[in-house]
From Swiss-Prot:
GO terms for biological process: protein transport; reproductive behavior. Residues 1-39, 170-230 are cytoplasmic. Residues 197-230 are annotated as: Disordered. GO terms for cellular component: recycling endosome membrane; trans-Golgi network membrane. This is Secretory carrier-associated membrane protein 4. It comes from the Eukaryota. PANTHER family: SECRETORY CARRIER-ASSOCIATED MEMBRANE PROTEIN 4, SECRETORY CARRIER-ASSOCIATED MEMBRANE PROTEIN SCAMP. Pfam families: SCAMP. Residues 203-212, 220-230 have a biased composition (Polar residues). It comes from Rattus norvegicus (Rat).
Length: 230
């Protein structure tokens, strides 16, 4: 955003890379939605942590006799979904609440819904998906109890992520419908191109109100020289 230096992700100063986004909940998100947006952010962090724990569990699975492909896929999920989930569903949610953007709400519902389905699949734990879910964990207890106990941790974390994602979708949808959001508004934003970087609500208000009145209204003055009452 103009006049604001990007601050996320926070990177060490010695790296040649610079932060890609500006993120400040107290500055950009309306007070009534700050708690919810922060919870969505924490959900993203929890899901990324789950992917990291899943990678360790898949390594234990592999060492105990499981397929090495699961470890490879777990590494791919961690590297791929950590940045993509932030860009593809957290940022739309952030921009949606920042500017009451119907297009970003729609993008959030679509992508976050797909993320929810994927997380449910990861929690179930189908063989060959690179996720230590319930089926993979329970089935491996007969082979290695120690590895299965490690695998149980991401199974629980994937399940918690899926539950919180479902609750989040319901809460965000209620707010969206209550604020009068619609597909027509999303199409209008798409046509105008404002979906890319919608202005904050404060900026929209300032643009709408403008300088309609001078800071100090002037009172008309009338010359009294030569004027007499009859």
């Amino acid at each position: 955003m103009a006049g604001k230096e990007n601050n996320f992700p926070p990177l060490p100063h010695f790296l040649p890379l610079k932060p890609c986004f500006y993120q400040d909940f107290s500055d950009e998100i309306p007070v009534e939605h700050q708690v919810l947006v922060k919870r969505i952010y924490r959900l993203w962090m929890f899901y990324c942590t789950t992917l990291g724990v899943n990678l360790v569990a898949c390594l234990a699975w592999w060492i105990a006799g499981g397929a090495g492909a699961n470890f490879g896929l777990a590494m791919l999920w961690l590297v791929l979904f950590t940045p993509c989930s932030y860009v593809c569903w957290f940022r739309p949610a952030y921009k949606a609440f920042r500017a009451d953007s119907s297009f970003n709400f729609m993008a959030f519902f679509f992508i976050f819904g797909a993320q929810f389905v994927l997380t449910v699949i990861q929690a179930i734990g189908f063989s060959g998906w690179g996720a230590c879910g319930w089926l993979a964990t329970i089935g491996f207890f007969g082979t290695s109890v120690g590895a299965a106990v490690v695998m149980l941790i991401p199974a629980i974390m994937f399940s918690l992520s899926a539950v919180v994602m479902a609750i989040t979708i319901v809460k965000v949808h209620r707010i969206y419908r209550g604020a009068g959001g619609s597909l027509q508004k999303a199409q209008t934003e798409w046509s105008a191109g404002t979906w890319r970087n919608p202005p904050s609500r404060e900026a929209q208000f300032n643009s709408f109100s403008g300088n309609s009145l001078p800071e100090y209204p002037t009172v008309p003055s009338y010359s009294t020289s030569g004027s007499q009452w009859p």
